[in-house]
A protein has these predicted regions:
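Bacterial N-terminal signal peptides that target proteins for export
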Residues: 1-12
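Short, intrinsically disordered, low-complexity terminal segments
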Residues: 2, 21-23
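Noncatalytic, solvent-exposed loop/strand surfaces
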Residues: 25-166
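Bacterial N-terminal signal peptides
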Residues: 11-21
Length: 166
């Protein structure tokens, strides 16, 4: 049983395309603690040990407010939540540390450990988060609120003793 030259060419081209597509796929972290939620990241070219004085500080900011949020990093921004006064804010920074925008997304919790605790979840150009007082919010990468709902009000529920932290 023989294959024609055209069939061989199409088969080899298809296999090479599949192989290069699979191996060229960019690493994307779409879950908490990385792919598979293991906390293990397969990056290469990382330092084997830290310099004695530690890594150099690229930038810092005190403009986000107070809280316990982790950052969410995308290709073009760094997002973090923080409490300012009685409200929770989502702040977007450029990769060089300049504030792009800051958007109020709900009232902060007044319960124990009252500062912001919500780490933004990023998916397809939108950020999802929840305020300390139960406001579930979707914010675009332009800082505009797409939708918001307070689930304590919607479901006639009371706030938990220690507020909300997802």
């Amino acid at each position: 049983m023989f294959m024609s030259a055209k069939t061989k060419f199409l088969l080899i081209t298809g296999l090479l395309t599949l192989i290069f597509t699979i191996t060229a796929e960019a690493q994307s972290v779409n879950e908490w603690r990385g792919n598979g939620r293991t906390g293990i990241y397969p990056e290469t070219s990382l330092l084997k040990s830290w310099p004695a004085a530690g890594p150099s500080l690229l930038w810092e900011s005190m403009e986000a407010g107070t809280g316990f949020s982790s950052v969410t990093v995308t290709d073009d921004a760094v997002y973090i939540t923080g409490r300012k006064g009685d409200d929770d804010y989502l702040t977007a920074y450029s990769q060089d540390g300049k504030v792009k925008w800051s958007t109020r997304y709900g009232k902060a919790s007044d319960s124990n450990y009252p500062d912001s605790r919500s780490t933004p979840t990023y998916s397809n150009g939108k950020l999802y988060l929840v305020s300390g007082s139960g406001d579930m919010v979707c914010i675009g990468t332009d800082g505009k609120v797409k939708w918001s709902v307070n689930y304590f009000q919607k479901y006639n529920a009371s706030a938990p003793r220690f507020g909300i932290s997802e």
